[in-house]
Swiss-Prot record:
GO biological process, one term: aerobic respiration
Membrane among keywords: yes
Subcellular location as annotated: Cell inner membrane
Subunit structure: NDH-1 is composed of 13 different subunits. Subunits NuoA, H, J, K, L, M, N constitute the membrane sector of the complex.
EC number: 7.1.1.-
Keyword Cell inner membrane among record annotations: yes
Pfam families: NADHdh
Family the UniProt entry places it in: Belongs to the complex I subunit 1 family.
Protein known as: NADH-quinone oxidoreductase subunit H
Role, per record: NDH-1 shuttles electrons from NADH, via FMN and iron-sulfur (Fe-S) centers, to quinones in the respiratory chain. The immediate electron acceptor for the enzyme in this species is believed to be ubiquinone. Couples the redox reaction to proton translocation (for every two electrons transferred, four hydrogen ions are translocated across the cytoplasmic membrane), and thus conserves the redox energy in a proton gradient. This subunit may bind ubiquinone.
Catalytically driven reaction(s): a quinone + NADH + 5 H(+)(in) = a quinol + NAD(+) + 4 H(+)(out)
Amino acid sequence: MSVITPDTVEILLTVLKAVVILLVVVTCGAFMSFGERRLLGLFQNRYGPSRVGWGGSLQLVADMIKMFFKEDWVPPFTDRLIFTLAPMIAFCSLLLSFAIVPVAPGWMGADLNIGILFFLMMAGLAVYAVLFAGWSSNNKYSLLGAMRASAQTLSYEVFLGLSLMGVVAQAGSFNMQVIVDSQTHLWNIIPQFFGFLTFIIAGVAVCHRHPFDQPEAEQELADGYHIEYSGMKFGLFFVGEYIGIVTISALIVTLFFGGWHGPWLPPFIWFAIKTAFFMVMFILVRASLPRPRYDQVMAFGWRICLPLTLINLLVTAAVILYHAQ
């Protein structure tokens, strides 16, 4: 009896696809750190990284070498086990969030019927990493940053989930592949424009990106919950943040802009172009908007985003019921 059966081959191909996709995501997250610095330099009329390699092309390699050889110091006053687990949980949860995103027909890490719920679960799991990092560091700035991050993330995850319910109701499924197929003739950005607005705002807040980077506010908290981290532990937090940006950008494309659908070019190329556009938008927002106060961030979520998502969901339900009659 042969060990290699059609089922075994299918499982191996699925695992291989998942590994390739996740490796590409990690690479994109790493390269985004270099791209962000170059674009910020362009936006601010100055040079970005330009010393290592031609035009700064090897800056990422230099940063990786520096990160690998930095001392991985654990302060003696920390809870060593939790302190070490926190960056691993943060990195893995953000990376696994991308597994449900279809980058082309048949190309996704995990074809789950509850794809959107899986993403929300992974986003919620990242909150534990932040809390673990802040509490185990035994530092007042870390703890304050972790408390801010957990309150902000849990609040905006409510709007993140509600903004997706209109898309789910229209497609009739939580499966990402089904949602993409439902946009063959009309992208969800048109009927779900308010859902898109609240999703992109909540996505920025969940990623702790400027202007919602209150947990890491340098002027107030001296870099927040990862102030005590160094070496590869800090590197996992750092790359994880950019992986979060890649994931949110890919989800925006998948849920509201037709995923891989587009004329002439191959599906994967269309998906990459659309995702890159929103990644640049994240950087542009960082370069152009000021940071509001923490109470203003929370008030904006509960007073503006929550009513907007509920109105969008109510209107979507009314339209679906009208067409069903």
